[in-house]
Amino acid sequence: MPSFEEELARMIRKQPSDLYILPHDRYYQLSLAIKGTLLPFKQVTRDYGQRFISYLKYCANMAVSEHRRPQLGAFKFTYAHQKINLRLSSVGDYQGRESLVIRFIYPLNDIRFNFLVPHQWERLQQYRQQRGLILFAGPMGAGKTTTMYQLARQLLPKQIVLTIEDPVEIGHPGFIL
């Protein structure tokens, strides 16, 4: 059985936006959200699933002994010399079975920016020159946050960028967070 770190690395190689660790009667299902689609990754024993959740909660400074109340946490995981931010959310059901969801937040430089076709990006560049609000909508993993940060980075250093995102998903040294 691979270590928990090796398990995370195997998942990160697939570039998911999220990992879902969900309990079933006799096992835990690990599923990855990739480009807005939830794909089964692996079924593990209940014991392994609970230990994996405990390990992740420990890394994120969450209360490992709390299995019922919702909790939030975060930690950084190093993969291929890059620090990836992991944002965790756990909750238990009425049977005391715990679920955990992880959002993987990749460094902006490492994100493959292929969400838009060229004419869409050019149009956004034109809108960026004007004043007003640009609204982004779409499913999870569609590239909304990445697109906004790519646009905001182009404003530096001539303009100040203040982010109001909570929690901040992508940090940048030039932004006021």
Where are the model-predicted features located?
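Walker A (P-loop) phosphate-binding loop of P-loop NTPases
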Residues: M140-G141
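Conserved lysine of the Walker
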Residues: K144
